[in-house]
Amino acid sequence: MGTFAIERTVAAPPDQVWDVITDWAGHGRWVPLTTMRCDPGPTRVGWSFSGLTGVGGLRFADVMRITDWAPPSEGGSGRFRLVKVGRWLAGWAEVSVLPVARGEQTRLLWRENIVVRPIPLGRLLGPLTDRVNAVVFARVIADMASEAEGAAGAPSSGR
């Protein structure tokens, strides 16, 4: 329930892709109707951020905490894991960047589990929210990939 996976090859090196996907304050550029709030300081294990999504007074916070943090070094692989600890959403995300094509491209692997709380409501809504999340995140990740490719000066890999 609530788990989806997206894999994408990005025409940019792993460190460039990493910089884009871990620009937590910037996630509002890609996630519709969302503004971000982040802990001060650099990202690290235990660091938290949240996406506040909605319109007007109808908003909810997706609060997340980093549980694993391993940025890529010198064109190598990187990964992070987070857990969702907010009132309305449970789940986790595991994201990896892997060098391909002599480090000129990146294989981006994004697995995420999103469950509406309370859990019985999440089970009921799961079939709908799973489809919506897969579509929204495919678009979000495509936009992130395009930004990373643009920053790297590479042609877009398409959507």
Across the structure, where does each feature detected by a protein language model lie?
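Helix-adjacent hinge/juxtasegments
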Residues: L58-W69, R81-K84
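A short, structured loop/turn motif at beta-sheet edges
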Residues: P14, P42-T43, D68-G76, S96-R107
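Hydrophobic ligand-binding cavity/cleft-lining segments
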Residues: M1-R44, R159
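Short, surface-exposed coil-to-beta transition loops
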Residues: T3-A5, R59-M64, L89-E94
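Short beta-strand segments that buttress and anchor functional surface loops
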Residues: S48-V55, R79-G86
